[in-house]
Amino acid sequence: MKLDVINLDGGKAGSVDLDDAIFGIADIRGDILQRVVTWQLAKRRSGNHKIQVRNEVSRTGKKMYKQKGTGSARHGSRRAAQFVGGAKAHGPVVRSHAFDLPKKIRAMALRHALSSKAKSGSIIVLDTAVLTDPKTAALRANFDKIGLKNALVIAGPEVDGNFKLAARNIPNIDVLPNAGLNVYDVLRRHTLVLTKDAVEAISARFAEKEAA
């Protein structure tokens, strides 16, 4: 697959070949994408919800009344879950919501996510993502020229500092380095913008995995 390379002013700056094994998958596996997005979001959950168990509730542990002779149940503590102000039975505690997912599934999902963007014509290739000044207004004007309203920009091995500063105040624009490329962020934005360096890095990344 061949795409035109453009610059930030919208002018053509050559062309680039995209690997069909990464960007040309025809049958997109939505089930694999769903599994990986769920895995990513589960890892992000803080898991800090917490209730007080019986030994943490600030209530008396003294026996409420004598064991026999009252006709009532044999309660022994106000901390029991059935009483107002008592503990919560089987409530949430601090834990990790993360779970394991095979690396091959994660790699497959990334290929399918990239292919879905290519299939819908939602990939733009930039020559570079570098600015001389961190001016948000200037970058927004450039994005308007190339029709970017909602996009993920993969800017190369490192994100240019001026580009990062200029882009962070623009709504619905995310900027990540090559290492930050992930399924969730690819899918949540309408357009995927790759620099030429990013395209080469993606191809090299999957070539290394296949060699391994």
Swiss-Prot record:
The keyword Ribonucleoprotein applies. Transmembrane segments: none annotated. It comes from the Bacteria. The keyword Manganese does not apply. Keywords: Ribonucleoprotein, Ribosomal protein, RNA-binding, rRNA-binding. InterPro entries: Ribosomal_uL4, Ribosomal_uL4-like, Ribosomal_uL4_dom_sf. One of its GO terms (biological process) is translation. One of its GO terms (cellular component) is ribosome. One of its GO terms (molecular function) is rRNA binding. Belongs to the universal ribosomal protein uL4 family. One of the primary rRNA binding proteins, this protein initially binds near the 5'-end of the 23S rRNA. It is important during the early stages of 50S assembly. It makes multiple contacts with different domains of the 23S rRNA in the assembled 50S subunit and ribosome. Forms part of the polypeptide exit tunnel. HAMAP family: Ribosomal_uL4_B (MF_01328_B). Part of the 50S ribosomal subunit. This is Large ribosomal subunit protein uL4. The gene is rplD.
